[in-house]
A protein has these predicted regions:
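Short beta-strand His + acidic residue motifs that chelate non-heme Fe in jelly-roll/DSBH
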Residues: 60, 84-86, 103-104, 108-115
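Fe(II)/2-oxoglutarate
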Residues: 139-186
Length: 186
């Protein structure tokens, strides 16, 4: 459910042209509205995101979600469980309910809910500005050049990986051999 979205639609999850506005759903959550309004600058997309038990979100990049780029993505876990596996660039992230976390989602990341209960996070995207940057430790602010170099390696690896996977899938289909339906994620 979107609390802030393009055009104020609580069901519109995409970044669309136009102004990001609060949705009617946010009227039901004044405490969350106070959290969102407490950050300097303009919020873009803000969502309550749920991952059901046994659901996967496979490796992907959110290209503009970095302190070095256009938007900063902040997470506040609301409900989680010990079966959740979340990685950013193969680094395990264990985020507990009520904590505020920044992740550089321009790096590859994935998650899996291996537990028996849903995982719910308040996920907030804010346009990068100097006041927001000032909230981050100096080491994170100063690491932009290093992150760009590492991010390029990740992007190059993604290109190679896709070529190998697509080539393998083509060969497998030519031989009419079916690949396995599941692969272990973690």
């Amino acid at each position: 459910v979107c609390l802030v979205s393009s055009g104020g639609d609580p069901y519109e999850d995409r970044y669309l042209d136009g102004v990001f506005t609060k949705t009617p759903a946010l009227n039901l959550a004044p405490y969350m509205e106070g959290i969102i309004d407490g950050f300097p600058g303009r919020s873009s997309r803000v969502r309550l995101m749920q991952l059901r038990p046994r659901e996967n979100v496979f490796w992907h990049f959110d290209g503009w979600q970095s302190l070095d780029k256009r938007y900063v993505r902040l997470h506040i876990p609301i409900v989680t469980n010990s079966g959740v596996r979340f990685q950013i660039s193969h680094e395990d992230c264990r985020w507990r309910p009520g904590e505020l976390w920044y992740g550089d989602f321009a790096f590859p990341h994935r998650l899996y809910n291996g537990g028996d209960s849903p995982r719910v996070h308040l996920v907030m995207d804010f346009a990068v500005n100097n006041d927001l940057k000032a909230l981050f430790p100096r080491a994170i602010q100063d690491g932009a050049k290093t992150r760009r170099k590492i991010r390029k390696l990740c992007t190059d690896s993604k290109v190679v990986y896709r070529k190998v996977v697509y080539r393998t899938v083509q060969v497998v289909h030519r031989q009419t051999v079916q690949p396995p339906l599941t692969w272990p994620l973690f």
